Amino acid sequence: MKFAETRIANRLVKDIGRIYDKAKRNPINFTDRETATIGGTQTDNVLFLEDFRDLIPHINVIKGLIEGEIGTELAWQWVHFVEYDKGGHQELHNHQDCEEISFILYLNDCKGGMTAFTYADKVTHWKEVPPKRGRMVFFSSGINHYALPALSKKKIMVGGLKRPEL
């Protein structure tokens, strides 16, 4: 499994966004540690936050879609929300030490803020994904990627999964 893209039902994206917008009012849900997010905010792992309990059935739908696509049962490792301000971006990184499969679900349309996937040289892009509400990409966690600066507010839900036996 290298890279795949799919669309998530508008109702599901709306429900996820509504849960996030309600929970983001509580500062306890946000991390105070350093992250790769620059010019924005990132939640702690929502799998363990009370304000996000209603999110679990929705993210399990997403897990089921990914499992169906790759033909393997998966277990959650983490899920975060990231909200970028204008100019916010993400440094080049991968998740190979945390999980097998990573995903990004775009919760809104925005200008700029493309996610770029790079070859091993970490410079040449082999794929650029513009933020579009309901678009979801999932990919092998060792793939290097980063987010270009957003020109308007950008909201995403990101997560990681791996096979239960690993």
Predicted regions and their residues:
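Non-heme Fe(II)/2-oxoglutarate
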Residues: M1-T72
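Catalytic core of non-heme Fe(II) oxygenases with the double-stranded beta-helix
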Residues: G64-L166
